Each structure stands twice: as C-alpha cells, then as structure tokens.
Amino acid sequence: MSEAARLIAPEKRGEDLDATMRPQTLDEFTGQAEARANLKIFIEAARNRGEALDHVLFVGPPGLGKTTLAQIMAKELGVNFRSTSGPVIAKAGDLAALLTNLEERDVLFIDEIHRLNPAVEEILYPAMEDFQLDLIIGEGPAARSVKIDLAKFTLVAATTRLGLLTTPLRDRFGIPVRLNFYTVEELELIVRRGARLMGLGMTDEGAREIARRARGTPRIAGRLLRRVRDFAEVARAEAVTLKIADEALTRLLVDSMGLDQLDRRYLTMIAQNFGGGPVGIETIAAGLSEPRDAIEDIIEPYLIQQGFIQRTPRGRVLTANAWKHLGLNPPRDVEASQFRLTLEDD
C-alpha cells in the first residue's frame, strides 16, 4: 500500500482543502493552546507597532494545522498571504519573483522548507535578515552584483524535519513554534465542528470514536468524518452513532488505535521476522517496499507516540504495548533485551 493510498495518510489531498471547514481565527482554532497563546501576543505586539511580525518556523508532523495557522496569522495581521513550497522554488529567479511582489508586512508561507534548493536558500538569508536581494546579473567577466530592496515581510515556514534545516536558516527564525499531536478531547471538538458545518447529526459517542482513531491529527479526523458520513447517509441514519462510526471505520480497516494495514504490517514484520527487533530502518523499508523517509516521517511518529516502538542505536524495537495490540506473545527474552537496549540508550 503506497502512502498516497492510505486513508489515514496525513498529507494534503484535494478533498482536504475545503476552505469552509478551516478555522478563520486563532480563537476558532482548536488545540495547540500554548502556541496559539504566544502567537496572539506576537501578532498583537507587531500590529500595535505597525511592524512586520518576526519570521516564524512551524515544526511538527504533517496534518497538524501549520498552513491553517499561517493563513490565520495573515488574516489577523490584516495583510496579504502568499503560499508556496520548498520543492516548487527551483531557482533564485523563482524566489526573487515571489519576494519582489510582496507588499509591506505581507506573509509569505513556504511549506516543506527543508526541501529548499541550497542555492535558493543562500538568496533567502539577506532577504530575511536585511530585506534585500543580492543577485548576480550576467556571466563571466560581465557579471555584477545587484542589491534590490524588499518590503519588510514575514516569512512563515513549515517543516516536518527540523534536523534537515541548516543552522544559518534555522537561526534566522525569531519565532520557532513546535506543534504536537492533538488529544482525543481536542479532536472530538474538531469532529463536532466539522459535523455541524456539514449539517450532519453526531452523537457524543460517535464523535469520540472518530477522534480516537484519527492518530492525533485533525486532517485525518476530517477525512474519517467524511467517510463515516458516507456510511451514515447510505444507511439513512439520522446521526452518526458509536455503532455506525465503529462499523464504518472497521470496514475501512482503521482499528481502535487508528492503525491501518501499513502500520500493522510494520509491527507484524518486526514481530514475526525479527523477533521484535532491533532491526534497522533500511531493512524495514525494503521489507515494506516503502521509502525510508515515508517510514520515518509518516508511520513511525505516531507509533512512537503511542508507545508501540522504540528507536535505539541498533534499530527499531517493539514494546510490550505493540505485542499486546497485535495479539501476539513476545519471545521470553524480549523484556531482558529491551532493558539492555534502554541502558545502552542512556
């Protein structure tokens, strides 16, 4: 199963981009309480001074609301919002075109900034720090450096892999913001809001069941809600109940913990083929026929957060929670081996 085919894949899809479902203000935004509280202060201070907000870096797994927060920030600052992504900016001229079209205090959002071309990144440094573009015009002996003054803008960037950002780029963001997985209670509020906007009846138990299986991710909660709505409408149900939500999600192969076939293949392979681990990431990638990046960025964060696996210097290891969830008995020596690995980590 490819990552793109997964119902619970946290990456954006066309159906996820319904603007009417997005919160429009920080007060409407559910979850990330600490980040929202700080952003409110920074936004109000910048607005009162009539200055551009300092550059902001959002860090966290996909689907947690980085793009939505960037849009809300621009709206609350009362400025224009421009959006792009790291892979799209292929050359310096692409970046120059974006920056020179910005007005004073505008917000430029760059998603996946860790995938920015290194040559483009070099151009970004003076733009962020001095609001100037340093461009080389011409080639060979006729080449000359030209400085272009820019409007004072705010760069809001998002990354799922902070470690891939260079230190010079990372240090130029004055406001780093880490986003965390959402609680079931927060996701339940998001599901309720989505159902209300859809005109869909929803019981407390139905909302909680969808929230429990959404992997701590609002984007996945919205996607599951839409699929459960399909089942409810075909069944001519007046509201989504626990029974309808459970039956729909079970038929979609999303289990009680939000794991799908690929997650279970990951855990089962380590359990049955490698005795619970440790096993290296390259071996896992080959066994699943999935890219290493997809495993590290998409599959493993939630499994680690739920306490199903440990990352150790010698490889991935299943925990007692994973064995229990799979309904398998761990080898007799698994607890002792995990204890030794924990000591090695320390």
Curated annotation (Swiss-Prot):
BP terms from Gene Ontology: DNA recombination; DNA repair
Cellular compartments annotated: Cytoplasm
Protein name as annotated: Holliday junction branch migration complex subunit RuvB
Binding sites annotated in the UniProt record for ATP: R22, G63, K66, T67, T68, E129, D130, F131, R172, Y182, R219
Enzyme class: hydrolase
Database matches in InterPro entries: AAA+_ATPase, AAA_lid_4, CbxX/CfxQ, DNA_helicase_Holl-junc_RuvB, P-loop_NTPase, RuvB-like_N, RuvB_C, WH-like_DNA-bd_sf
SUPFAM superfamilies (UniProt xref): P-loop containing nucleoside triphosphate hydrolases (SSF52540), Winged helix' DNA-binding domain (SSF46785)
Function: The RuvA-RuvB-RuvC complex processes Holliday junction (HJ) DNA during genetic recombination and DNA repair, while the RuvA-RuvB complex plays an important role in the rescue of blocked DNA replication forks via replication fork reversal (RFR). RuvA specifically binds to HJ cruciform DNA, conferring on it an open structure. The RuvB hexamer acts as an ATP-dependent pump, pulling dsDNA into and through the RuvAB complex. RuvB forms 2 homohexamers on either side of HJ DNA bound by 1 or 2 RuvA tetramers; 4 subunits per hexamer contact DNA at a time.
Binding-site residues, Mg(2+): T67
Region entry Head domain (RuvB-H), spans: 256-346
Domain of life: Bacteria
Binding partners and assembly: Homohexamer. Forms an RuvA(8)-RuvB(12)-Holliday junction (HJ) complex. HJ DNA is sandwiched between 2 RuvA tetramers; dsDNA enters through RuvA and exits via RuvB. An RuvB hexamer assembles on each DNA strand where it exits the tetramer. Each RuvB hexamer is contacted by two RuvA subunits (via domain III) on 2 adjacent RuvB subunits; this complex drives branch migration. In the full resolvosome a probable DNA-RuvA(4)-RuvB(12)-RuvC(2) complex forms which resolves the HJ.
Residue sites binding DNA per the record: R292, R311, R316
Organism: Rhizobium meliloti (strain 1021)
CC annotations in GO: cytoplasm; Holliday junction resolvase complex
UniProt entry keywords in alphabetical sequence: ATP-binding, Cytoplasm, DNA damage, DNA recombination, DNA repair, DNA-binding, Hydrolase, Nucleotide-binding
Upper lineage: Bacteria, Pseudomonadati, Pseudomonadota, Alphaproteobacteria, Hyphomicrobiales
Domain observations: Has 3 domains, the large (RuvB-L) and small ATPase (RuvB-S) domains and the C-terminal head (RuvB-H) domain. The head domain binds DNA, while the ATPase domains jointly bind ATP, ADP or are empty depending on the state of the subunit in the translocation cycle. During a single DNA translocation step the structure of each domain remains the same, but their relative positions change.
HAMAP family assigned: DNA_HJ_migration_RuvB
Keyword DNA damage among record annotations: yes
Region (Small ATPAse domain (RuvB-S)): 183-253
